[in-house]
């Protein structure tokens, strides 16, 4: 269809309809007081017009395209353009501001505030830009409620802080006032094996609630188990707050999973969604020790205890990081390399005394991901022990696609007592309704593999995985900057750029939630992402780096 131009601005995303000119907008999360309506009034506005031809710009603005699934073939990708819109001699714009009510997370009502300061006339090639805007946001009919004190958890403040207007409770005596409850739902087969894990978590200060499926109050179905967990949540009081963590112990034959609402996939999300009338924002952090046998569960328990107690024979492996932008001729040069470059530029580098095993696509590293030796080299790096291994591109349920690293390779690993977190931003690596997915293989293997695996139970998308890792931005580039993006999973985990302590996401489940919340802020396929991204491992574990 010819050439177009793109408007990209740091921190901006887009709110344009598919096929319409892609105009930058600002998208921020806000918290809405219980029972209130939102009123927004413009107090001051300054704008100006720009004639693009005066800047020697003759091409029209690029039409907004849907995010592309990482499972899509190049020949299947359709170009979207609304020709009638591009023929209009009039300014095309979204509302200057609008709010979208989202859902609740532990009784905090979330909404998205979108500000669209750009209008565009595609015939005259003119832009109208709001250069200064002052808004007044009021919450009308606000009701007083002490629900938050019953459901408040300091470990969720990290999520609420994503809302630009969130005010936390008084910090006085937070640890003693708001104890952290940890619920374990397990097949009774694993009750004895879980006791060392429970003893350790109790020593750490968690209040552990054990629930086994042979208890009629718990049961063996998704509905009965959810009803039990929800009863713990709903019965919360100021002096006995709602639980924060859920660990599911067993494969789907022992503890079944839900079917997703936004696609055909398994999802544990709904065990932890209670207060949003069917929304998709969890009220608890959750993870799964997936296993069918006592040995498979005990292997995960032992690795978790070894990691948390820092019982490594040689902890030097925690200095090693593996980062891979997998093979894709169309998207890897920008999306894949951009994600990995952001990680190495900001966090995982020599300046942090880390040893980086970096695999960019095409060029830029000693071994690029499209070289024949890449697969063997990556497997060797992991086999020698890594604090983090992160891959973005194509996968199947049994592992990374190209370069290949899959479940059969896990059995050959030699990283005994040297295992960390693996993050797979790709399709299906945590599809745990298969006999054994990649995440399950990494966790179940004895004394090697990984202590945690974050990945999806269905196909993922290029835009959303980029936002998940790097943060919300419309400027998807091979060299993103911290100043040009919102907070993604990397930033929230590593917290080295002056982020307030409340913005630190340091447990395995918090890292996952930070990525999903970046997708929510961007306005991407958020329901789908909250449903498909899962943690195999202990949700409260804080993975070491360095």
Task: Report each predicted region and the residues it spans.
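Cysteine-dependent hydrolase recognition
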Residues: 1-546
């Amino acid at each position: 269809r010819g050439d177009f131009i793109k408007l990209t601005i740091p921190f901006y995303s887009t709110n344009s309809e598919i096929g319409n000119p892609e105009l930058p907008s600002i998208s921020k999360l806000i918290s809405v007081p219980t029972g209130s309506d939102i009123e927004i009034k413009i107090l001051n506005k300054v704008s100006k017009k720009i004639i693009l031809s005066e800047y020697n710009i003759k091409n029209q603005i690029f039409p907004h395209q849907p995010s592309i699934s990482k499972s899509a073939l190049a020949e299947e990708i359709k170009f979207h353009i609304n020709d009638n819109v591009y023929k209009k001699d009039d300014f095309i714009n979204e509302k200057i501001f609008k709010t979208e009510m989202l859902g609740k997370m532990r009784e905090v009502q979330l909404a998205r505030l979108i500000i669209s300061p750009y209008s565009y006339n595609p015939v005259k090639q003119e832009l109208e830009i709001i250069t200064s805007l002052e808004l007044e946001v009021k919450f009308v009919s606000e009701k007083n409620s002490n629900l938050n004190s019953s459901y408040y958890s300091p470990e969720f403040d990290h999520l609420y802080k994503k809302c630009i207007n969130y005010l936390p409770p008084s910090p006085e005596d937070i640890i003693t006032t708001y104890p952290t409850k940890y619920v374990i739902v397990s097949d009774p087969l694993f009750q004895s094996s879980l006791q060392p894990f429970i003893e350790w978590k109790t020593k750490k200060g968690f209040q552990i609630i054990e629930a086994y499926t042979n208890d009629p109050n718990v049961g063996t179905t998704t509905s009965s188990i959810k009803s039990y967990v929800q009863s713990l949540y709903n019965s919360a009081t100021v002096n006995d707050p709602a639980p924060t963590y859920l660990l599911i112990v067993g494969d789907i034959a022992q503890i079944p999973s839900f079917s997703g609402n936004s696609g055909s996939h398994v999802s544990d999300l709904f065990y932890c969604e209670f207060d949003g009338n069917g929304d998709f924002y969890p009220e608890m952090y959750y993870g799964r020790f997936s296993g069918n046998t006592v040995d498979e569960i005990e292997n995960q328990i032992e690795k978790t205890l070894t990691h948390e107690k820092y019982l490594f024979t040689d902890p030097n492996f925690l200095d090693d990081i593996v980062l891979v932008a997998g093979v894709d001729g169309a998207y890897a040069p920008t999306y894949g390399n951009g994600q990995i470059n952001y990680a190495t530029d900001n966090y995982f580098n020599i300046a942090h005394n880390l040893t980086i095993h970096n695999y960019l696509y095409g060029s830029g590293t000693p071994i690029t991901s499209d070289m024949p030796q890449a697969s063997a080299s990556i497997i060797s790096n992991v086999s020698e022990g890594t604090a983090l291994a992160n891959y973005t591109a194509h996968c199947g349920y049994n592992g990374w696609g190209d370069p290949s690293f899959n479940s059969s390779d896990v059995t050959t690993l030699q990283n005994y007592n040297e295992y960390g977190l693996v993050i797979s931003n790709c399709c299906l690596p945590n599809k745990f309704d298969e006999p054994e997915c990649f995440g399950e293989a990494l966790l179940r293997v004895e004394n090697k593999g990984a202590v945690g695996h974050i990945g999806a139970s269905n196909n993922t998308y290029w835009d959303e995985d980029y936002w998940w890792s790097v943060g919300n931005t419309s400027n998807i580039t091979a060299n993103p900057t911290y100043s040009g993006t919102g907070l993604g999973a990397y930033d929230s985990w590593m917290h080295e750029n002056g982020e307030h302590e409340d913005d630190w996401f340091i447990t395995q489940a918090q890292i996952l939630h930070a990525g999903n919340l970046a997708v929510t802020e961007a306005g991407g396929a958020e329901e789908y992402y909250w449903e498909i991204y899962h943690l195999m491992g202990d949700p409260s574990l804080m993975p070491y780096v360095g």
